[in-house]
């Protein structure tokens, strides 16, 4: 029954009111999240209404608005308008034009207004209509109906709606569809891989092996998570299969398995040592060694690929201390991209191939920097306190996850490619680290 409800919810979004309404003279409100001067918008939430005009609902409707508010607090380009600032309150006569009074929201400084209508009431199994209006012009940005809504599915409805809203405003909506794989400390010499939504929901443990898991990586198809694993006896490649919920541990000759990373074709790059120093190897779809990707007398670790698989960022000690390099997988050319500092590690290339985030040791500690491949310049995007490390670009090439102990314990934080105020991802008790983004198919 629950499976059918989920299918109805996401496959049956039959009622689409409008998408990106606009004219040649005045298009819909949009935000450029990639340009240097990122703008922001003020957004207000109207009270959810039932079938009787001017009468708010008090059950699932209130909960859904709460989940939406919680989600939108993670978007730095949206500022939520305090309901107390709206003269006349947030309860309107209707939830769609012309029965909505946008003037009160406009006076409170809102650029956008979200309305929620429950034509059959908000009992389990009903449907909700969600719309977004421009406060000034009254234009509809978009609207959708979500059917067969149940209490347990409300977070999913909020995620889907917020993804649609972000896509309408920015052109990208992957953030709310993403899932982070990360490592959580669970006692002495015990670390396992966990999953969590970037807003902190759906927290769950997926491995339970003796020893320590490190550096998880999602496959592009959302089926596998690979990770480094070591116990008292050996190092190995761990593989979790989402379809079977099984974990296997794969050994290789040598004693080191470091930083596995999926390529766009679902093959894996990983650092293995068969001699003195580790080199980067390609594994096939059966996780068997296929060929070398980068070999050098020095240490070569931490591969990271763009969405095309033609660019590989990695860390190497070939110039003495660890530095970040870029390899053109078509020509084989290798270029150093960490221009300053004596200790630069843990690169993460953005899927669009334009940026590389990495950890730099500075005079004030380890910090996250972003190198721009176009302008060939770098900028600092995290500022502590404590130790900031292990950056990871999201599928939208906008958000970055990283690990920090600024509050004492290791925790996961989100920031954007531009920097800004970090937002902590709730992961429960225990140290959390090595966050990596993935997309699970709906």
UniProtKB/Swiss-Prot annotation:
A GO cellular component entry from the record: periplasmic space
InterPro entries for this protein: 6-blade_b-propeller_TolB-like (IPR011042), PD40 (IPR011659), Tol-Pal_TolB (IPR014167)
Keyword Lipoprotein set for record: no
Localization terms from the record: Periplasm
Top-level lineage group: Bacteria
Short name of one Pfam family: PD40
Any one of the GO BP annotations: protein import
Signal peptide from the UniProt entry: 1-26
Keyword field: Cell cycle, Cell division, Periplasm, Signal
Disulfide bonds listed in the record: none
Keyword Protein transport in record: no
Subunit and interaction comment: The Tol-Pal system is composed of five core proteins: the inner membrane proteins TolA, TolQ and TolR, the periplasmic protein TolB and the outer membrane protein Pal. They form a network linking the inner and outer membranes and the peptidoglycan layer.
Role noted for this protein: Part of the Tol-Pal system, which plays a role in outer membrane invagination during cell division and is important for maintaining outer membrane integrity.
Family classification: Belongs to the TolB family.
Protein name listed in UniProt: Tol-Pal system protein TolB
Organism: Nitratidesulfovibrio vulgaris (strain ATCC 29579 / DSM 644 / CCUG 34227 / NCIMB 8303 / VKM B-1760 / Hildenborough)
């Amino acid at each position: 029954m629950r499976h059918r409800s989920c299918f109805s919810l996401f496959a049956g979004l039959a009622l689409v009111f409008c998408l990106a309404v606009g004219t040649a003279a005045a298009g819909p409100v949009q935000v450029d999240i990639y340009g240097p001067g990122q703008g922001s918008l003020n957004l207000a939430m109207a009270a959810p209404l039932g079938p009787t005009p001017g009468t708010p609902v008090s059950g699932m409707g209130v909960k859904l608005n709460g989940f939406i508010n919680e989600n939108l607090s993670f978007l730095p380009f949206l500022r939520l308008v305090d309901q107390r600032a709206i003269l006349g309150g947030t309860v309107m006569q209707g939830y769609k034009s012309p029965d909505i009074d946008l003037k009160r929201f406009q006076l409170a400084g809102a650029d956008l207004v979200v309305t929620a209508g429950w034509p059959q009431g908000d009992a389990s199994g009903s449907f909700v209509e969600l719309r977004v209006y421009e406060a000034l012009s009254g234009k509809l940005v978009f609207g959708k109906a979500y059917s067969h809504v149940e209490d347990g599915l409300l977070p999913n409805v909020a995620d889907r709606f917020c993804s649609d809203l972000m896509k309408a405003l920015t052109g990208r909506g992957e953030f709310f569809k993403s899932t982070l794989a990360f490592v959580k400390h669970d006692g002495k010499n015990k670390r396992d891989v966990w999953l969590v939504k970037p807003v902190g929901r759906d927290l769950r443990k997926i491995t339970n092996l003796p020893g320590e898991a490190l550096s998880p990586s999602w496959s592009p198809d959302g089926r596998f998570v690979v990770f480094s694993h070591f116990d008292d006896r050996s190092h190995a490649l761990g593989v979790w299969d989402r379809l079977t919920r099984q974990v296997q541990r794969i050994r290789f000759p040598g004693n080191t398995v470091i930083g596995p990373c999926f390529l766009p074709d679902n093959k894996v790059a990983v650092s293995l040592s068969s001699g003195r120093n580790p080199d980067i190897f390609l594994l096939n779809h059966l996780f068997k060694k296929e060929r070398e990707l980068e070999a050098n007398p020095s240490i070569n670790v931490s591969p990271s690929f763009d969405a095309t698989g033609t660019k590989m960022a990695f860390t190497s000690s070939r110039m003495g201390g660890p530095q970040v390099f870029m390899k053109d997988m078509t020509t084989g050319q290798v270029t150093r991209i960490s221009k300053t500092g004596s200790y630069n590690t843990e690169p993460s290339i953005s899927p669009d191939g334009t940026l590389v985030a990495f950890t730099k040791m500075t005079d004030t500690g380890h910090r996250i920097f972003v190198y721009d491949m176009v302008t060939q310049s770098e900028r600092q995007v995290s500022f502590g306190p404590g130790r900031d490390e292990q950056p990871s670009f999201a599928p939208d090439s906008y958000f970055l996850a990283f690990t920090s102990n600024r509050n004492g314990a290791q925790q996961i934080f989100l920031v954007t490619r531009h920097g800004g105020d970090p937002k902590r991802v709730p992961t429960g008790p225990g140290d959390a680290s090595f966050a990596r983004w993935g997309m699970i198919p709906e």
